UniProtKB/Swiss-Prot annotation:
In-chain residues carrying the UniProt-annotated modification Phosphoserine: 280
Highest taxon in the source lineage: Eukaryota
Cysteines joined through disulfide linkages: 148-227, 349-353
Bilayer disposition of the protein: Multi-pass membrane protein
Subunit structure: Interacts (via C-terminus) with MPDZ and PATJ. May interact (via C-terminus) with MPP3, PRDX6, DLG4, DLG1, CASK, APBA1 and MAGI2. Interacts with GRM2 and DRD2; this may affect signaling.
Side of membrane Cytoplasmic, spans: 98-111, 172-191, 259-322, 383-471
One protein family per Pfam: 7tm_1
Protein name: 5-hydroxytryptamine receptor 2A
PANTHER family membership: 5-HYDROXYTRYPTAMINE RECEPTOR (PTHR24247), 5-HYDROXYTRYPTAMINE RECEPTOR 2A (PTHR24247:SF30)
Presence of the UniProt keyword Membrane in the record: yes
Organism: Mus musculus (Mouse)
Motif PDZ-binding: where in chain: 469-471
Length: 471
């Protein structure tokens, strides 16, 4: 088989080609041994009149051809990783701005998401660019050796903080479902920030042994010139403590939350059906009551009879929030599981597994895990209207939501409410006249009914007037 590789290279680039030749000879010694033995037979170098070099390669790929191919691969890798870095930084900055500026998003869960966005943003600022640099240098560490342990520490810290935040969110949602009154009473902004501080403290404690021991002994963070965790104990313990244990807690609490929400929804539906049957019962003949009074009686609620019960609206909101969080959990697990599973396999089957294959898989899977930091803002944009509208305004440099002036609200609202109030008063007068002559059999019952309905109508009128005055 003959492979032909032709390229035009200026004479000024020959020294650079020779330097690349030396690098490639270190990486591919077998190819260069065969080249040295058959140099005169395999290649032909000619210089034309325009001082340009034409390279013709037959039967093998010479150093310059190999360097060009590797350079193209590195260019594509650099382009893809640059896109991931930009998406990670920009998207998470938008999330931080949205939670900070939008009052609708200022609750415990979104505070956790903002802290998660800070961890992902720092991962994009401090970890991903260095990882891209190592790719361009053939996975060799190009920076001072002391920075290797610091870089691994930051990588483990922010990755651990991400899953710890998701685990804390899952636990917090489960507690909110189980004890809604207690959770709403004691879950203030200060409590939420204390929980976030606890999450970061745990993440720092898990990742701190890396710089402590790595700065003392380079062999724990260097392997054949590459910056990576070379200590098997670090790999095993770190993988279980920083990923698999929080993952188990997160999955269990999430499914318990879904089960509790389904139970709450079933109870709420049964309560509504029971209330509908009881409220539809009346001591008065339907002929003696107007349709408006029947409607008022059917929706009349006894105060405090269902205190502490969750409404269908709150359950629906919880289900929507769990749906979005479930997607975030699922994507995080799917994107990080391959890396940690391969990491465990590299330690367990060190002798039977091919180290080159394991290393190549880890290099790919770690960037798939990094990609999860860029995906979260996209999930919020797709499934949350408040985030979506906030992001669109921030991209247009509009940091405050445009609201209608109070005068327009008064002009549009007061006439409608005043009209409804007048109609209600007219209807009350007509109904009182119609019910003024009851039959003898229903006299006592109708009198009580009229008193009750008049009180209800009066309350409704007062409520409407209060709304008008408040607006």
């Amino acid at each position: 088989m003959e492979i032909l590789c032709e390229d035009n290279i200026s004479l000024s680039s020959i020294p650079n080609s020779l330097m690349q030749l030396g690098d490639d000879s270190r990486l591919y010694p077998n190819d260069f041994n065969s080249r040295d033995a058959n140099t005169s037979e395999a290649s032909n170098w000619t210089i034309d009149a325009e001082n340009r070099t034409n390279l013709s390669c037959e039967g093998y790929l010479p150093p310059t051809c190999l360097s060009i191919l590797h350079l193209q691969e590195k260019n594509w890798s650099a382009l893809l990783t640059t896109v991931v870095i930009i998406l990670t930084i920009a998207g998470n900055i938008l999330v931080i701005m949205a939670v900070s500026l939008e009052k609708k998003l200022q609750n415990a869960t979104n505070y956790f998401l903002m802290s998660l966005a800070i961890a992902d943003m720092l991962l994009g600022f401090l970890v991903m660019p260095v990882s891209m640099l190592t790719i361009l240098y053939g996975y060799r560490w190009p920076l001072p050796s002391k920075l290797c342990a610091v870089w691994i520490y930051l990588d483990v810290l922010f990755s651990t903080a991400s899953i710890m935040h998701l685990c804390a969110i899952s636990l917090d949602r489960y507690v909110a479902i189980q004890n809604p009154i207690h959770h709403s009473r004691f879950n203030s902004r200060t409590k939420a920030f204390l929980k976030i501080i606890a999450v970061w403290t745990i993440s720092v404690g898990i990742s701190m042994p890396i710089p402590v021991f790595g700065l003392q002994d380079d062999s724990k963070v260097f392997k054949e010139g590459s910056c990576l965790l070379a200590d098997d104990n670090f790999v095993l313990i770190g993988s279980f403590v920083a990923f698999f244990i929080p993952l188990t807690i997160m999955v269990i609490t999430y499914f318990l939350t879904i089960k509790s929400l389904q139970k709450e929804a079933t109870l709420c539906v049964s309560d509504l059906s029971t209330r509908a049957k009881l409220s539809s019962f009346s001591f008065l003949p339907q002929s003696s009551l107007s349709s408006e009074k029947l409607f008022q009686r059917s929706i009349h609620r006894e105060p405090g009879s269902y205190a502490g019960r969750r409404t269908m609206q709150s359950i629906s909101n919880e289900q929507k929030a769990c749906k979005v969080l479930g997607i975030v959990f699922f994507l995080f697990v799917v994107m990080w599981c391959p890396f940690f599973i391969t990491n465990i396999m590299a330690v367990i089957c060190k002798e039977s597994c091919n180290e080159n294959v394991i290393g190549a898989l880890l290099n790919v899977f770690v960037w798939i895990g990094y990609l999860s930091s860029a995906v979260n803002p996209l999930v919020y944009t797709l499934f949350n209207k408040t985030y979506r509208s906030a992001f669109s305004r921030y991209i247009q440099c509009q940091y405050k939501e445009n609201r209608k002036p109070l005068q327009l609200i008064l002009v549009n609202t007061i006439p409608t409410l005043a009209y409804k109030s007048s109609q209600l008063q007219v209807g009350q007068k007509k109904n009182s006249q119609e019910d003024a002559e009851p039959t003898a059999n229903d006299c006592s019952m109708v009198t009580l009914g009229n008193q009750h309905s008049e009180e209800m109508c009066t309350d409704n009128i007062e409520t409407v007037n209060e709304k008008v005055s408040c607006v």
